[in-house]
UniProtKB/Swiss-Prot annotation:
Keywords: ATP-binding, Ligase, Magnesium, Manganese, Metal-binding, Nucleotide-binding, Purine biosynthesis. PANTHER family: PHOSPHORIBOSYLAMINE--GLYCINE LIGASE, PHOSPHORIBOSYLAMINE--GLYCINE LIGASE, CHLOROPLASTIC. Pathway: Purine metabolism; IMP biosynthesis via de novo pathway; N(1)-(5-phospho-D-ribosyl)glycinamide from 5-phospho-alpha-D-ribose 1-diphosphate: step 2/2. Its EC number is 6.3.4.13. It holds the Pfam family GARS_C. SUPFAM superfamilies: Glutathione synthetase ATP-binding domain-like, PreATP-grasp domain, Rudiment single hybrid motif. The keyword Cell cycle does not apply. GO terms for molecular function: ATP binding; metal ion binding; phosphoribosylamine-glycine ligase activity. ATP binds at residues 134-190. InterPro entries: ATP-grasp (IPR011761), ATP_grasp_subdomain_1 (IPR013815), PreATP-grasp_dom_sf (IPR016185), PRibGlycinamid_synth_ATP-grasp (IPR020561), PRibGlycinamide_synth (IPR000115), PRibGlycinamide_synth_C-dom (IPR020560), PRibGlycinamide_synth_C_sf (IPR037123), PRibGlycinamide_synth_CS (IPR020559). It is an enzyme of class 6 (ligase). Coiled coil: none annotated. This is Phosphoribosylamine--glycine ligase.
Length: 412
């Protein structure tokens, strides 16, 4: 069987790598992919993730047995709808269901309607009433652009000036709507589930690190590292999240005529009042995918085929140890990342997922985005895995790049 993964980052590299482990998979294509993936024998295809017609044609010509969608932009662009219309097997939500991520306001309205615990909020489509609400509520508050913002459309404001500036930025840009939420304090974690026809197959939870610098300092990013599982979040808490968040949301989407197929990401926070929902994503997270998927012992391709066919999938996960991943980013990220930096030589035996990379005229891998690659390691516990991973990472010639030195420290 041939598989097509849509997307170009570290998440898609992790998906492609996992699919290649399947004995029934002969070839894995990634569109558009990146040059780093070729080291693993993955075929990269020069088709944009937003070119639905070309992707459909490629899948037909290559007789692709399964397509898996990575990024939210492709989902919101209706790639799943295009494949379904062409009667091609694809795993991901259609455009209507992807609205759970595509609009923060829509997601909040679903949570409110179906009793899913989340922060109190208000939505505004112009600046003046939003500023008035700000004055009324005071800080801290969380300000979110309604639409897709590549993981960077959220500002946690602890002072009024930051809040006003965030609102001004959102309304002066392409976003015409903003959600203002109460600030929730607690321990954040990510719960991914495979979903189809109302059936839910949860994965081990992960915790990612959004801030750019050590000690959770600096601006928000798409994620600077992650680890899985999160042992200080109990099984009881995870069950509470499934019962109170994932199940009613999946059932609610069916009720709304927007049945969800694909990977549902619940961004959660354990507060003094129990689990609350921060956000939903309609796909795997990045970098969490790179630490969750290596823990799957079963055949991912077969599991997805079974889920789509309505059969019970085999999903067995590593029961001990921890998988840790650290993102290496180009200096200047998340605002103006340096492009064209030559990547260090990666020694054999280092598990790497490439993201923002391309090749120069000398066939060397160079940085072409903010988050450049992720190095992962699996070990007995967070502390020993951290030590192992950072010893290897610190030996690399990472001039012009930076990474956090404390990924996983919350678990120690």
């Amino acid at each position: 069987m041939k598989i097509l993964v849509i997307g170009s980052g570290g998440r898609e590299h992790a998906l492609a790598k996992k699919f290649m482990e399947s004995p029934q998979v002969e070839e894995v294509f990634v569109a558009p992919g990146n040059s780093g993936m070729e080291k693993d024998g993955i075929q990269i295809v020069d088709i944009s993730e937003l070119s639905n017609d070309k992707l459909v044609k490629f899948a037909q010509n290559q007789n692709i047995g399964l397509t898996f969608v990575g990024p939210e932009t492709a989902l919101m662009n209706g790639v799943v709808d295009a494949f379904i219309k062409a009667e091609l097997p694809i795993f991901g939500p259609n455009k209507m269901a992807a609205e759970l991520e595509g609009s923060k306001d829509f997601a909040k309205s679903i949570m409110k309607k179906y009793g899913v615990p989340t922060a109190d909020y208000a939505t505004f489509d112009s600046l003046e009433p939003a500023l008035a609400y700000l004055d009324e509520k005071g800080v801290p508050l969380v300000i979110k652009a309604d639409g897709l913002a590549a993981g960077k459309g959220v500002t946690v404001a602890f002072d009024i000036e930051t809040a006003k500036s965030a609102l001004a930025d959102i309304f002066s840009g392409s976003q015409g709507k903003v959600v203002i939420e109460e600030f929730l304090d607690g321990e954040e974690f990510s719960l991914f589930s495979f979903i189809h026809d109302g059936k839910i197959y949860p994965m081990p939870i992960a915790q990612d690190h959004k801030r750019a610098f050590d000690g959770d300092k600096g601006p928000n990013t798409g994620g600077m590292g992650a680890y899985s599982p999160v042992l200080h979040i109990s099984k009881e808490v995870v069950n509470e999240a499934l019962e109170k968040v994932v199940k009613p949301t999946v059932a609610g989407m069916i009720e709304e005529g927007k049945s969800f197929t694909g990977v549902l990401y619940a961004g959660l926070i354990l507060t003094e009042d129990g689990v609350k929902t921060i956000e939903f994503n309609a796909r795997f997270g990045d970098p969490e995918t790179q630490v969750v998927l290596p823990r799957l012992k079963s055949d991912l391709a077969q599991a997805i085929i079974d889920i789509l066919a309505g059969n019970e999938p085999t999903l067995e996960w590593l029961e001990s140890g921890v998988t840790l991943g650290v993102v290496v980013a180009a200096e200047g990220y998340p605002s103006q990342a340096k492009l064209g930096l030559i990547l260090p030589e990666i020694p054999e035996g280092l598990n790497v997922y490439y993201a923002g990379v391309s090749k120069n005229e000398n066939n060397q891998l160079i940085s072409s985005g903010g988050r450049v690659y992720l190095v992962s390691e699996t070990g007995e516990d967070v502390k020993s895995t951290q030590k192992l991973l950072y010893e290897k990472l610190d030996k690399l010639e990472n001039d012009g790049f930076f990474y956090r030195h404390d990924i996983g420290s919350r678990a120690i």
